[in-house]
């Protein structure tokens, strides 16, 4: 493009990415940044995260109380479009505007990517509130 501003459809991403602002030239080690106000670490930016939820164009509009996570185990003979999973959040390769948990895209479940990871979680539903409070902000 003669103006030098580029073109949304021809360029890699629509915004500028500042990939080295934090001093890391590659993905960063888990836990090197401070916890957020909920005591959680590394909630956005290093890698986007696989979810167990299938990807549909309708997105969250298709969710309901009966099927809140839109799970579907695609069979070998199913169309390829049914084998997409939702990927949430941005990664090291994305511009700042994508680094939020509400950002959502799709990837085929059999396609590994260097910018997509997963998050190990555990439920505090069966824990006592005191135990949950005592571990807030502490790393194991």
What does each model-identified segment do?
Residues 22, 112-114:
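A short catalytic or substrate-binding loop motif that flags glycine-/basic-rich loops and adjacent residues
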Residues 114-130:
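Short, structured beta-strand segments at or near domain termini in extracellular proteins/domains
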Residues 65-66, 73, 111, 122-124:
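Short, intrinsically disordered/low-complexity patches at protein termini
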Residues 51-54, 105, 124:
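Short beta-strand segments enriched in hydrophobic/aromatic residues
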Residues 95, 107, 111, 126-129:
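Enrichment for repetitive, rod-forming helical segments
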Residues 74-79, 105-112:
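Short proline/glycine-enriched turn/loop segments at secondary-structure junctions
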Residues 1-100, 129-139:
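Functional-site microenvironments in short loops/helix caps that host divalent-cation chemistry
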């Amino acid at each position: 493009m003669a103006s030098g501003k580029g073109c949304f459809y021809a360029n890699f991403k629509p915004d500028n990415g500042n990939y080295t602002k934090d001093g890391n030239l590659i993905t960063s080690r888990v836990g090197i940044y401070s916890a957020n106000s909920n005591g959680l670490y590394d909630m956005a930016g290093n890698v986007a995260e696989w979810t167990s939820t299938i990807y549909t164009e309708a997105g969250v509009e298709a969710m309901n109380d009966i099927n809140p996570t839109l799970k579907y185990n695609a069979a070998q003979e199913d169309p390829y479009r049914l084998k997409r999973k939702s990927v949430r959040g941005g990664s090291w390769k994305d511009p700042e505007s994508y680094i939020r948990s509400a950002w959502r895209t799709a990837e085929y479940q059999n396609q590994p990517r260097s910018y997509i990871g997963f998050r190990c979680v555990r439920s505090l539903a069966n824990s006592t509130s005191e135990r949950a409070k005592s571990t807030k902000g502490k790393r194991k």
